[in-house]
From Swiss-Prot:
Domain annotation CSD: ranges: 4-63
Record gene name: cspL
Protein name: Cold shock protein 2
Record bears the keyword Transcription: yes
GO cellular component, one term: cytoplasm
One Pfam family, short name: CSD
Induction of the gene: In response to low temperature.
Annotated keywords: Activator, Cytoplasm, DNA-binding, Stress response, Transcription, Transcription regulation
GO molecular function: DNA binding
Gene source species: Lactiplantibacillus plantarum (strain ATCC BAA-793 / NCIMB 8826 / WCFS1) (Lactobacillus plantarum)
């Protein structure tokens, strides 16, 4: 698991970006957020996540808000 901070997240569109500890921006889709109910993230929120290589670059999976 990696640690990061939510750079921005658009709840209407269901995606955003996490900035990893190494400064890399990682795409995050709402379906990767491991919470019950409405899946959204807040700017500046701390998260842990796994990372995989997507079609357009790094993508977060198994995102867990802290």
């Amino acid at each position: 698991m990696k640690n990061g901070t939510v750079k921005w997240f658009n709840a209407d569109k269901g995606f955003g970006f996490i900035t990893g500890e190494d400064g890399t921006d990682v795409f995050v889709h709402f379906s990767a957020i491991q919470t019950d109910g409405f899946k959204t993230l807040d700017e500046g929120q701390k998260v842990t996540y796994d990372e995989e290589q997507g079609d357009r670059g790094p993508q977060a999976t198994n995102v867990q808000p802290q």
